[in-house]
C-alpha cells in the first residue's frame, strides 16, 4: 500500500494556543492506525498580539508581543510532551540572516529561550 512506503507522518502545526490537545487527539488516530513516527515539519507563531489564536494568519497586523509568541511555544511543547509519538518540530522561522527578522522569527526573542529550554529537556 501507499502507507507501506511512508517513513514518517508529518504535518504543519499552526494551531490556536488553546486547541493543541484537540488537534493532537485528531492526529493521534492516524499515527496509531499506521504506526509511523510523527513530526511537525513546520510550526510557529508570530510575535504579533492576537497571533496565538490564529498562528497560521501571516497577514495579521498589530503590536509586537514577544510574550504571546513565547506563550504559544510553551503551550505547544507542553501539549506535545504528553504524546510520546511526537518526535520533533521544524521551527518557523529560523533564518540564516538575522537582519530584518520576520514576525515569525524567534531569534533573540523570548520564544528562543522557550525552545532552548525544551530541547535541553530532551536526551
Protein language model features and the residues they cover:
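Aromatic- and acid-rich polysaccharide-binding/catalytic face
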Residues: 1-22, 26-28, 36-37, 41-49, ...
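A general structural detector for well-ordered alpha-helical segments in enzyme core domains, enriched
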Residues: 2-5, 23-30, 72, 76, ...
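Short, surface-exposed, polar/charged, turn-prone segments marking secondary-structure boundaries
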Residues: 18-19, 37-40, 66-68, 116-119
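Alpha-helix C-terminal capping segments
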Residues: 30-34, 80
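A short helix->loop->beta-strand "cap" motif at the edges of active sites that frequently abuts
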Residues: 34-36, 86
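Aromatic-rich peripheral "rim/lid" segments of glycoside hydrolase catalytic domains that contact
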Residues: 50, 55-58, 67-72, 79-123
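C-terminal beta-sandwich/jelly-roll accessory domains of carbohydrate-active enzymes
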Residues: 61-63
Amino acid at each position: 500500500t501507499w502507507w507501506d512506503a511512508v517513513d514518517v507522518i508529518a504535518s504543519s502545526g499552526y494551531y490556536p494556543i488553546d486547541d493543541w490537545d484537540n488537534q493532537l487527539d485528531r492526529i493521534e488516530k492516524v499515527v496509531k492506525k499506521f504506526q509511523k513516527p510523527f513530526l511537525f515539519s513546520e510550526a510557529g507563531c508570530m510575535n504579533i498580539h492576537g497571533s496565538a489564536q490564529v498562528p497560521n494568519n501571516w497577514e495579521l497586523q498589530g503590536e509586537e508581543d514577544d510574550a504571546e509568541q513565547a506563550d504559544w511555544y510553551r503551550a505547544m511543547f507542553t501539549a506535545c510532551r504528553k504524546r510520546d509519538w511526537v518526535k520533533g518540530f521544524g521551527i518557523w522561522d529560523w533564518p540564516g540572516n538575522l537582519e530584518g527578522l520576520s514576525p515569525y522569527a524567534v531569534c533573540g526573542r523570548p520564544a528562543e529561550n522557550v525552545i532552548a529550554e525544551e530541547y535541553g529537556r530532551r536526551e
